[in-house]
């Protein structure tokens, strides 16, 4: 996998591996707001044996622990320089959601929002793995 940041209105921001489980229904009138019966949005995902390069960090981001039983194994990641990242900001792309999150500059993999993720043999070189 080799990703890059594209200028303009383009979904994605150079994240080679990215999972998000955030609210996207902000424009729905209150009376039509969907009733959520499950407390889990992403579950039982296993990614194994991926070599990737990207202009942004990898990320797994949920809300209130709604990502569970995710496993990343044997991931080899190289973060490369980007001409376009300053144009869009050092952020993950949560479109069409409205999450505003700046990726730490020294980050290779960010796990947030109470996500339940197991890691095994993850090589991010000098970039940090942040499990917040």
Roles of regions detected by a PLM:
Residues 1-132:
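Extracellular/periplasmic carbohydrate-active domains that bind, remodel
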